[in-house]
């Protein structure tokens, strides 16, 4: 079953733009750089499994650059290349779990650790007034990369409902 898990609170921080090196050269994206439709289209085309490396596995093995905010033996936090808020970063496990719905009982400690890292990194990024955590799961949940990841969004007043 596909789902999107969303946890929310209020917020406020400075707006940012990100320069992204890609196949079309360097692009600069602001907080509204990608539309919901773009992400849904990506999710519809994303392969939910397979042997091909994901963009996140390539960031983990350092074959793709990332603006890393935090790293330990279990996870990595880095800025999103297409931010949807003034502050938008991802927290990913180093263990390749494709979807939250495929996490196992043995992943319980790791999943809790990801949330704590999200909280501490949000604090370090100045999101003391609040932020939102999002985990997309599966095609209908608009998951576009099949490596579990938590989006942390903040730096402005977020709206409800999100979808």
Swiss-Prot record:
InterPro entries: Histidine_triad_CS (IPR019808), Histidine_triad_HIT (IPR001310), HIT-like (IPR011146), HIT-like_sf (IPR036265)
Major localization class: mitochondrion
Enzyme Commission identifier(s): 3.9.1.-
Transit peptide, start-end: 1-17
Domain of life: Eukaryota
GO biological process, one term: apoptotic process
Pfam families per UniProt: HIT
Residue positions of motif Histidine triad motif: 147-151
Domain named HIT: residues: 55-163
One CC-aspect GO term: cytoplasm
Reactions performed catalytically: adenosine 5'-phosphoramidate + H2O = AMP + NH4(+)
Binding-site list for AMP: 63, 80, 136, 142-145, 149-151
GO molecular function: adenosine 5'-monophosphoramidase activity; hydrolase activity; nucleotide binding
Compartment(s) of residence: Mitochondrion
UniProt KW keywords: Acetylation, Apoptosis, Hydrolase, Lipid biosynthesis, Lipid metabolism, Mitochondrion, Nucleotide-binding, Steroid biosynthesis, Transit peptide
Active site: 149 (tele-amp-histidine intermediate)
Modified-residue entries (N6-acetyllysine), positions: 119, 139
Entry's family note: Belongs to the HINT family.
Function summary: Exhibits adenosine 5'-monophosphoramidase activity, hydrolyzing purine nucleotide phosphoramidates with a single phosphate group such as adenosine 5'monophosphoramidate (AMP-NH2) to yield AMP and NH2. Hydrolyzes adenosine 5'-O-p-nitrophenylphosphoramidate (AMP-pNA). May be involved in steroid biosynthesis. May play a role in apoptosis.
Name of the protein this chain belongs to: Adenosine 5'-monophosphoramidase HINT2
Source organism of the structure: Bos taurus (Bovine)
């Amino acid at each position: 079953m596909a789902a999107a898990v969303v946890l929310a609170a209020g917020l406020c921080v400075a707006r940012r733009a990100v320069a992204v090196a890609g196949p079309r050269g360097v692009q600069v994206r602001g907080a509204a750089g990608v539309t919901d439709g773009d992400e849904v289209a990506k999710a519809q085309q994303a392969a939910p499994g397979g042997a091909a490396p994901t963009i996140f596995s390539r960031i983990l093995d350092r074959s793709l650059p990332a603006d890393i905010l935090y790293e330990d033996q279990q996870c990595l936090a880095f800025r999103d290349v297409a931010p949807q808020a003034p502050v938008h970063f991802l927290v990913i496990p180093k263990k390749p779990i494709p979807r939250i719905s495929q996490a196992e009982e043995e992943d319980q400690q790791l999943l809790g650790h990801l949330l704590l890292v999200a909280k501490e990194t949000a604090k370090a990024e100045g999101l003391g007034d609040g932020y939102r955590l999002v985990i997309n799961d599966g095609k209908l949940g608009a998951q576009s990369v099949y490596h579990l990841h938590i989006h942390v969004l903040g730096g402005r007043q977020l709206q409800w409902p999100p979808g």
